[in-house]
Amino acid sequence: MTALQELRAGVDVETIHSAPFGAELLEIVREARASARTVLFVVSDDRRAQAAAQIAEFYDPSLEILRLNAWDNLPYDRVSPTAAVASRRCAALAALAQDPEPKARLVITTSAAIAQRCAPKEALKDASLALKPGQIIAQDTLDNFLIANGYTRVPTVRDRGEYAQRGGIVDIYAPGEPEPVRLDFFGDALAVSYTHLRAHETL
């Protein structure tokens, strides 16, 4: 039984004061594993959120950890959120919307992030597209989907939210991906291999 389970069961537990930041994450990670549910961990700012993610990964490298960050602008600012911030937030929300089944997972966020409104779950599902090697999909269909969901077509992909198309090759820098992904089409079928452009490594 984890410490959090003991608290819910009314078991007498000792109180520990002045524990260093991150010590509580050991129990939170255990709780996520034991309950096979999504556990939300809220911290004060992005610096602590990043540190919490690193600590949780150290405690359980196989646990799925999602970072839900806040927008980096105010509602009435004249500038839009940066692509990096928008992509990370969208990736986390899309992962939660696509996989609602109970599972061991830790969501790390900030007080500012959870105070901001999110897109409806159905809208996030509709804006997501899963592609697999060998899948049949027309390039025009993929192109229309990317444009409809805010991707920018460019000659060479450099930032998240961009894609490039040259013949049967499509390079996409999607939210949540550490590197751009290359899709090779044979007719309307995706090739078996993906290429991470910056590393020039075929998987």
PLM-predicted stretches and their roles:
Residues 1-198:
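ASCE RecA-like P-loop NTPase motor cores
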Residues 199-203:
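A short, hydrophobic C-terminal helix/tail in secreted or cell-surface proteins
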